[in-house]
Amino acid sequence: MPRLDIVCCGDLVLDEPDPDHWLAGIAPALRSASLAIGHLEVPHTRRGKELSADVPAPGAPPEHLAALSHAGLDAVTLAGNHIADCGAEGIQDTLTALDQNGIAHTGAAMNVALARAPAWLESGGVRVALLSYNCVGPEESWATPARAGCAYIRVAPEGGDAIAPAADLRYPDPDSVGLMAQDVRDARNAGAEVCIVALHKGIVHVPARLAPYERPLAWAAVDAGADLVIGHHAHILRGFEFYRGRPIFHGLGNGCVVTRALSPDQSHPSRAAWARRRREMFGFEPDPAYTLAPFHPEAVHGLLARVVFDGASPIATGFLPLHFEPPGRPVLATGPAAEAVCNYLVRICQDAGLPRPCLTVTDEMVQIEAFKTSCPPLLK
């Protein structure tokens, strides 16, 4: 059977000029994969009315999506809390630009049926289905039969608050989870040999912590037939686990996020207020050197997830460590920076109550061993 090498990166925001430059540090790893997948965080449009239910992200230039193709990305997931920030026009312009650049997409569309439909990928004769769901709201971003938006899984907050990214989300709606599971089964029945589920989930800007719903929801995707589950949204790495022999990356952190929309020194009042308020809400002060990526200081540790399949069977799981250079550019990490990423992943897994990952450095990646019960320290 052919070998299938899948590499996944986290959130992508390419507001700044020269997007090829910002992606150049990770492009070699993306290009070398059989399939490379990322999460597109914001609409790429110059049109549309701002959504009022969340702090709206500005639309990025549609022509910047060509840089994703240049960097080697084959597909993007779209179901997230910002994809509808410029309304239906913003979604349509994003889909059009992705199509023009030959980038497959899933998770947002002009109605809910299209948003829930998988992106179909193929490499070496192996058919891969990619599905994408927003688990954090806002509800106004969710697609309906008559409204553009994203595919979603409803997660109810504590105390009946509105479903929104900053809410204390805890309780997955069984009907929503059932629809996701049916999507996975439908993809299998339609011929998917490998199925990947991407979940926009979790708590932003806080190290290690997983919301109560995150692990059960990822497990449900595997129970339905997913071979790989990837998470994003937190803008900081989350831990890893195997469930029934299938890898779950609970949060890939940032793939490449370079934007001035998170600066408190800007003219947009709600974005400037959010940039100030999030520091107070989440208890961190960004490193002033990271002017285009003012996230939690621990967000400098990143990774590209890598899973190798022998045909339809996963045979190796691991990651390529990333480091973010000021003002926010990701690069493949080596030496002490790579060691720091490995040690950080071990620590956040333990802090989140996940099994301690057993890491082995190989020529191809940092491999995560699935079935070891005792692991010697990888690094000093």
Regions found by a protein language model. Give the residues of each.
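Acidic, metal/ion-coordinating pockets
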Residues: 1-380
